[in-house]
Amino acid sequence: MSGSSVRMYRATPRTNSAPPKLVVVESECLSPDERTAFALLSSRVAAILVPCPAQGELAIQCQAHSGSLNQAAVIATSQRGLPLLLEAGIALALRGAGYENEAAADMVFKPRSSGGLAAAIEYVCRLVA
């Protein structure tokens, strides 16, 4: 057997089918299409952009918005989003955000360059509608 294997484990099991109360998008900036989708999402649920998430960032944001980790949805756009994905009740990632993110995600969307972030945000909009 060559090489090492890495296994990703989630902090919370995904058994909750309730809509999220908080959506965290790991991104520094948004394109016009992404901004439009994010504005719609923000009108329906607490939604924040987190460019460089720190350890425990999701727990801090959940506490600030009176929610739990199980009530949070995360969209990871790069490898920096992995800690958020592992704690979130709903974990979404974009293709190209890193193998670990794709493995930890409930759903993987197209790359950002192909409209994946806007599609992921629109997906969460449907969850909270």
Question: For the regions a protein language model found, what residue spans apply to each?
Answer:
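Conserved acidic, metal-coordinating active-site core of Asp-based
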Residues: 2-5, 12-21, 26-87
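N-terminal regions of proteins, emphasizing targeting and processing segments when present
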Residues: 10-12, 125
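Mg2+-dependent phosphoryl-transfer enzymes with acidic/Ser/Thr/Gly-rich catalytic loops
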Residues: 56-129
